[in-house]
């Protein structure tokens, strides 16, 4: 009987530990699902009201950023952009189509995830850009700086 009681206590303790671990894991701030991504009606999604997003299409003053201009072929600009993204720290391309790239960028310490998007319309020689944090209200300018660094890298490569 004592052995059965000890066994049940261990099972209850293990179950509680698993439930607490899952609860904490699900509620970690850096882990959340992305929403409002991709291209709709030839536009990237607008930014939320929080101060942790920039976008080059249809943005208000605090969220606006210039698109990246290029000369030459769209496919070459896209390939160069993909090469640049391979050297952006903690950034991984997770989706790409003929005219769209979606990458994830993680913060160094807390591993917060930012969604980084690029749209290359067929009728313009620009790359529209969007970078948004998944959580929080402010990113202290990280998304804007990241996109400006990507812009500078592409300019250095003379796209």
Named regions from a protein language model:
Residues 15-27:
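Bacterial N-terminal signal peptides
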Residues 27-159:
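Ser/Thr-rich, low-complexity intrinsically disordered terminal regions
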Residues 3-18:
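Bacterial N-terminal signal peptides that target proteins for export
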Residues 9-10, 24, 33:
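Intrinsic disorder/low-complexity signature
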């Amino acid at each position: 009987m004592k052995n059965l009681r000890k066994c049940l206590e261990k099972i209850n303790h293990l179950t509680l530990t698993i439930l607490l671990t899952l609860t904490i894991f699900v509620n970690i701030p850096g882990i959340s699902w992305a929403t409002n991504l991709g291209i709709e009606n030839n536009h990237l999604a607008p930014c939320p009201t929080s101060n942790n997003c920039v976008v080059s299409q249809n943005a208000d003053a605090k969220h606006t950023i210039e698109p990246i201009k290029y000369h030459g072929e769209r496919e070459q600009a896209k390939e160069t952009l993909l090469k640049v993204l391979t050297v952006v720290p903690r950034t991984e391309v997770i989706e790409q189509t003929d005219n769209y790239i979606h990458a994830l960028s993680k913060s160094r310490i807390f591993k917060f995830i930012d969604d980084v998007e690029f749209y290359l319309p067929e009728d313009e020689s620009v790359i529209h850009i969007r970078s948004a944090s998944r959580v929080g209200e402010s990113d202290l300018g990280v998304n804007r700086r990241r996109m400006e660094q990507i812009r500078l890298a592409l300019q250095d490569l003379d796209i």
